[in-house]
């Protein structure tokens, strides 16, 4: 156990981190292009934030939260989702007093949920999330959907489907609750135990249940779209017009309710088809009452979350190649007793802001090693005379490798013992 990561967690190893960095850079770029600024909130919050914000009838609160008492006897919870913490930060720091809308994103935020680990879903996973506060119009909903769609398309994800729904508001949802209770009332015995316990307080949770028997029970259930109030109906129609105008294909799925109680009006999912079936890669919606519920002013908001592990898994399964960056700008080798001279050269190059690695020449005895290390320049610190000629012959093969692979730009430096200073050729300053 000592040398094993806890179940449901995973290490990102040095040889794999470039993949994360590439995806994260694309996410940052997409957020910045749309005017979102980064927010970083604590990895844990007071438990009450999630009880009030996420909803005490959700799977997250009832089954999945990592909650504990700290040494001050305060109930603390590791963050199970990103929105509640972002809203808390907005309220605590009165960010709503600035110009609206207030647009923020979080990236590589660790999320903790105690659930059965599966491919693309871990107990600790990382999210990219966007939150837009103070935007009432459905154009904000459309903007986030389009941003997620274009980001995933840029990353090479294919077969994307945009699924949308409206789950109404406090004005029209009670009517739907009554309809759903009437429809499911004679079917309670067929529900799972969790849905039975939630049925009276929040029958919508039955629609979100992953148990097959519950999914069968609700497949012919009435649709919320049939009882939307005029405001919700107009908002949903407006969203569809924006998506159509942007040329983004979408479909209406009245079964989407998402797993969080704070959603109102728009909910959406971006789904892709894989060899193993449908995979939800992004989900979100509008939450017009959450800011007020947490203690702020009445402020409309919309957001989404996207799992980074799931995006990377999807890219792997579709064979999408992520460009590997050059590991070293300059690679210094040395022969014989020239370790000190090589060390001095490395430090001078680092001051000049070159990515650098110093290694004994004996460790670089294969041409393929130069390619594997993604080296731009190879620097050899050596004596003049026979050793120099011998090593040049060795490096000639690497020059051939350069022409074959385009991986190495070869540069030779000659360090001379006896007070001569090591010079840096112009070619070394090439990036």
What do the predicted segments below correspond to?
Residues 1-353, 358:
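TRNA-recognition modules of translation machinery and tRNA-sensing kinases, especially anticodon-binding
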Residues 351-431:
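Intrinsically disordered, low-complexity segments enriched in glycine and mixed charged residues
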């Amino acid at each position: 156990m000592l040398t094993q990561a806890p179940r449901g967690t995973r290490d990102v190893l040095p040889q794999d981190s470039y993949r994360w960095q590439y995806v994260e850079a694309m996410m940052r770029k997409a957020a910045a292009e749309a005017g979102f600024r980064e927010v970083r909130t604590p990895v844990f919050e007071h438990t009450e934030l999630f009880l009030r914000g996420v909803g005490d009838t959700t799977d997250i609160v009832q089954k999945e939260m990592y909650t504990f008492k700290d040494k001050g006897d305060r109930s603390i919870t590791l963050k199970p989702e990103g929105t509640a913490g972002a809203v808390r930060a907005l309220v605590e720091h009165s960010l709503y007093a600035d110009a609206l809308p207030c647009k923020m994103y979080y990236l590589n935020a660790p999320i903790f949920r105690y659930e059965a680990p599966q491919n693309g879903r871990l107990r600790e996973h990382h999210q990219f999330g966007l939150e837009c506060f103070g935007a009432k119009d459905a154009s904000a909903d459309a903007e986030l959907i389009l941003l997620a769609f274009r980001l995933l398309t840029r990353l090479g994800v294919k077969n994307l489907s945009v699924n949308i729904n409206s789950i109404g508001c406090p004005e029209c949802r009670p009517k739907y609750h009554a309809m759903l209770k009437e429809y499911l009332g004679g079917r309670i015995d067929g529900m799972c135990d969790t849905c039975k316990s939630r049925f009276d307080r929040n029958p919508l949770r039955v629609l979100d249940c992953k148990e097959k028997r519950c999914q069968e029970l609700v497949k012919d259930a009435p649709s919320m779209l049939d009882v939307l109030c005029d405001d919700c109906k107009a908002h949903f129609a407006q969203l569809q017009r924006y998506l159509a105008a942007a040329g983004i294909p979408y479909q209406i799925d009245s079964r989407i309710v998402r797993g969080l109680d704070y959603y109102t009006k728009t909910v959406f999912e971006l789904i892709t088809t894989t060899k193993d079936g449908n995979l939800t890669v992004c989900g979100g919606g509008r939450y017009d009452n959450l800011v007020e519920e947490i203690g702020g002013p009445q402020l409309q908001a919309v957001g989404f979350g996207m799992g980074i592990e799931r995006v990377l898994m999807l890219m792997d399964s579709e064979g999408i190649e992520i460009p590997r960056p050059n590991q070293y700008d300059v690679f210094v080798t040395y022969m014989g007793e020239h370790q000190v001279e090589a060390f001095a050269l490395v430090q001078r190059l680092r001051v000049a802001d070159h990515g650098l690695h110093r290694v004994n020449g004996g460790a670089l005895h294969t041409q393929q090693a130069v390619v594997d290390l993604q080296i731009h320049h190879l620097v050899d610190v050596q004596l003049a005379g026979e050793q120099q000629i011998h090593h040049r012959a060795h490096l000639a093969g690497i020059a051939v490798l350069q022409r074959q692979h385009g991986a190495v730009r070869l540069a030779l430096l000659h360090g001379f013992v006896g007070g001569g200073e090591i010079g840096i050729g112009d070619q070394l300053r090439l990036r």
